[in-house]
UniProtKB/Swiss-Prot annotation:
One of its GO terms (molecular function) is structural constituent of ribosome. This is Large ribosomal subunit protein bL34. GO terms for biological process: translation. It comes from the Bacteria. InterPro entries: Ribosomal_bL34, Ribosomal_bL34_CS. Gene3D superfamilies: 1.10.287.3980. Disulfide bonds: none annotated.
Length: 44
């Protein structure tokens, strides 16, 4: 049986990337929340 997670960098970046997060107000909210929490990685 084929596994469900077949990772690919490009689609991942396009849907959860930093630049995509910065596009919208809510996306920036996500980044700021993760900064406040002290996350090592802010976006995918």
């Amino acid at each position: 049986m084929k596994r469900t997670y077949q990772p690919h960098k490009t689609p991942k970046k396009r849907t959860h990337g930093f630049r995509l997060r910065m596009k919208t107000k809510n996306g920036r909210k996500v980044i700021n929340a993760r900064r406040a929490k002290g996350r090592k990685r802010l976006a995918a």
